[in-house]
Structure formats: C-alpha cells, structure tokens
C-alpha cells in the first residue's frame, strides 16, 4: 500500500477516480472515532462522498494488527447487502484494491449515531425490531447460496479483529473464565452458516430525525456463525443498561423487539437458542472490559459492574439475558 488517505489526498483521489467530474472545489474532513480505518468525508458542488482506508495497525492502546485487504471484503458485503436490503447500507461508488480505499455515498449530515443517542438518553426502542428484521433478512438470504459462501470464505479478518483481541485476550486476562469463553470461541470457529456482519451494533448505525436508519462498517464480514451478530448487538445494549440503569426498561423493550424482528425474517433457530445467545453476549461484554478494545462509554464503576454481570451470565446462561436485572 503506497497511498495514504488524509484530508489532503482525499480530493485528489476523487478526481483520479472520476468522482469530481466538474472539478468543483472540495472540502475534506476526517471523521473521528475510527479505530480500524481512516475515514474522510468529502463535499462540494455535486460531490458528497465518504472515503475509507483500512489500517494495518489499529488505533488502540494495545498492539493490534490486521490485514488491510479486508476493505475488499467490505466492498463485496456492501454490494451484496445493498441488493438484499436496498437503502440500508451506503452505496459503493468506487474502489481501489491496490491501496485498499473505498468510496461510498455520504449519509445525511443530520443522521445521528444510534449508540451516541442512547448515551444521551434517547433509546429509540422501536428501532430494535427494524435492526432485528434487517439482520434476519441478511442471515436468511445468505444461508443457502454457495456463491456467497465461496466469496466470503475468509476467516482471517474475523480472527484478527474479533477472536484474537476479544475472546483470546479475555481468556488470558480472566483465566477463571477461560473455559467458558474458549467454548464460545470454538463454536464461532466451527459453524459456518451464513454471511455474518461481525460489527452489527448501534455504534455502526445512523438514525435520521425522520426515523430512517442505516448500517455501516462491514469489514469483518465472513461466512460464519450467526449467533455472533446477535450477541454483538445485544452486548452493546446490555452494556448500556449497566452504564445507564434508568434506561434499562427501554433497552429491554429494544431487545425484545430486536429478537422478535430477527425471528420474523430469519426463521426459527438459525442463530441457536436463548442459552447460546446469552453465553455469547456475555463473552462480548467481557471483551469490552478486558479485551483489546474496551468500550469508551463505560466509566470505572460501570466497567466493574459489567464484569460481574457478564461473569454471572456466562456461568448460568440458561437464566437468560436479564437475569441480573
């Protein structure tokens, strides 16, 4: 990779790839919060584009490396899921495989990050069913198509970006939980049923004031175990419930809608039973306290509380997601 995406190089890249045909003056702004990629918004007359380049070393305190060619996987996933659920993911406008850069449509400026809204007290529980229906549509729509399985039959990004920094790190730092966490990790490695997003959570969803919503960040997409996507989403909701207890009932309604929506579009049992979903959710909660990428919205008190809640869920997953509440 010889090209480095930044606010100076982004407008040049657009011109070289035919995305500024009128040669309009452009404004490039780096969007914050990106751990795994450099993300630049570029706007001007007739131009509204988001550029993304995957990083080989992620922006966290611990050393965390991953192959930047996962950008090519994201492009393929955006195109496929854009066909399954039109208007839900950004449209791909251009792509440079050599330098691992993708250009996609810039979503509306008024759209807000859903996780940020939850942190401000606006839960939007009605969106839970929408999120579940979309995920179920993706899983069901990719579970019986051999061409999709062949295209996304790469597991290295999931190992580098999820199993190693999450499960394996938790096992080292919480040895008393290693057996249970390790069992979940092996389930994720051994089951290959459908296209798994790998990053499906409110932090990767935008919501407009009129209720329209979008999903972004698909660089971890792979053929795998669908329970991961449910658990990943649910882990953020339960983390939020621990962090902001006054929102817990609304968040519980959100979860109920999410699970109902997923069941309605995916079919029965695709992602396993409630016990399995709870165990995997607990693992991913621990990943956000003791893994390589801790959740920034947890304060010290909430982090300690999450450790206790997640350990309890992992010990008795048959009691359900809300047994602690």
Describe every region a protein language model picked out.
Residues 28-51, 183-228:
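Active-site acidic catalytic loop and adjacent metal/ATP-binding pocket
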Residues 19-26, 74, 178-190:
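Short Pro/Gly-enriched beta-strand edge/turn motifs at strand-loop
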Residues 76, 227-267, 281-301:
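Active-site activation/catalytic loop segments of kinase-like enzymes and analogous catalytic loops
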Residues 31, 36, 40-147:
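ATP-binding pocket architecture of kinase catalytic cores
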Residues 166, 268-325:
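Helical subdomain adjoining the active site within ATP-dependent kinase catalytic cores
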């Amino acid at each position: 990779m010889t090209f480095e995406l930044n606010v100076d190089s982004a407008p040049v890249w657009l011109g070289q790839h035919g995305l500024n045909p009128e040669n309009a003056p452009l404004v490039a702004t780096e969007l914050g919060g990106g751990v795994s990629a450099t993300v630049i918004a570029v706007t001007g007359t007739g131009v509204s584009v988001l550029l993304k380049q995957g990083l080989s070393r992620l922006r966290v305190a611990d050393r965390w490396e991953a192959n930047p060619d996962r950008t090519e996987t994201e492009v393929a996933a955006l195109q496929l899921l854009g066909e399954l659920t039109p208007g839900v993911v950004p449209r791909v406008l251009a792509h440079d495989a050599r330098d691992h850069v993708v250009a996609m449509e810039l979503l509306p400026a008024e759209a807000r990050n859903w996780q940020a809204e939850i942190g401000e007290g606006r839960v939007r529980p009605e969106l839970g069913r929408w999120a579940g229906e979309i995920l179920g549509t993706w899983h069901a729509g990719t579970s019986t198509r051999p061409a999709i399985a062949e295209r996304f039959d790469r597991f290295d990004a999931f190992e580098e970006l999820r199993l190693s920094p999450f499960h394996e790190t938790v096992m080292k730092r919480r040895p008393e939980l290693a057996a249970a966490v390790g069992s979940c990790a092996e389930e994720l490695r051994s089951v290959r049923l459908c296209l798994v997003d790998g990053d499906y959570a409110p932090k990767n969803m935008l919501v407009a004031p009129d209720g329209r919503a979008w999903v972004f960040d698909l660089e971890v997409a792979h053929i795998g175990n669908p329970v991961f996507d449910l658990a990943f989403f649910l882990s953020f909701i339960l983390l939020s419930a621990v962090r902001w207890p006054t929102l817990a009932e609304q968040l519980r309604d959100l979860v109920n809608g999410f699970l109902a929506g997923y069941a309605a579009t995916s079919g029965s049992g695709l992602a396993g039973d409630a016990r399995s979903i709870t165990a995997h959710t607990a693992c991913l909660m621990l990943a956000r306290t003791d893994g390589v990428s801790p959740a920034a919205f947890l304060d010290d008190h909430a982090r300690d509380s999450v450790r206790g809640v997640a350990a309890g869920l992992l010990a008795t997953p048959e009691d359900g997601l809300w047994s602690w509440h």
